[in-house]
């Protein structure tokens, strides 16, 4: 926090922005921004339950609906579901075939995607508590690994290519888990 305040004093409001290892302000494209947000939500997903409330406080929409903030948020899950569907439809119409994303976000994406695809067969039945915990832990570890990488080592500045078709396939699988 002290470093951020020092950068703000030195260069202004841009000093609060993320930087890569070299100290340059880190800039990314729109797909990476929304993908990082989506992956962060999915890393807190509990199958057949909702989105884990890390702060254990209700979000504004939960509180307005008199939902207790303990545990998981179905409201956040419903908003995520709506967004996944919107993104799927939008990308399906896009002529873009590939996007460049940060290597770190690419690794995060692969970890979340692999967790879902490796466990797709559980959607044939009710998910056991053991399997639910296994999936939840794998998603959570993916999120923790991403956060630790960025917090401890910053972004490397290296890019990876993501096929839009792969992203669309991921959205389909994620929607299957959310809808289960």
PLM regions: where:
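Acidic, mature catalytic/reactive cores of soluble proteins
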Residues: 1-180
């Amino acid at each position: 926090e002290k470093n951020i305040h020092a950068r703000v004093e030195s260069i202004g409001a841009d000093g609060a922005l993320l930087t890569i290892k070299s100290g340059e302000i880190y800039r990314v494209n729109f797909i990476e921004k929304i993908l990082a947000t989506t992956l962060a939500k999915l890393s807190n997903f509990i199958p057949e339950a909702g989105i884990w409330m890390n702060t254990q406080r209700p979000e504004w929409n939960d509180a307005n609906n008199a939902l207790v903030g303990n545990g998981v948020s179905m409201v956040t899950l419903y908003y995520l579901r709506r967004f996944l569907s919107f993104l799927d439809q939008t990308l399906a119409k896009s002529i873009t075939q590939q996007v460049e994303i940060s290597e770190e976000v690419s690794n995060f994406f692969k970890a979340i995607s692999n967790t879902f695809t490796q466990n797709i067969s559980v959607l044939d039945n009710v998910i056991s508590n053991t399997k639910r915990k296994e999936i939840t832990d794998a998603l959570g570890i993916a999120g923790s690994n991403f956060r630790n990488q960025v917090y401890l080592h910053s972004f490397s500045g290296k890019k990876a290519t993501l096929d839009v078709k792969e992203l669309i396939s991921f959205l389909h699988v994620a929607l299957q888990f959310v809808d289960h």
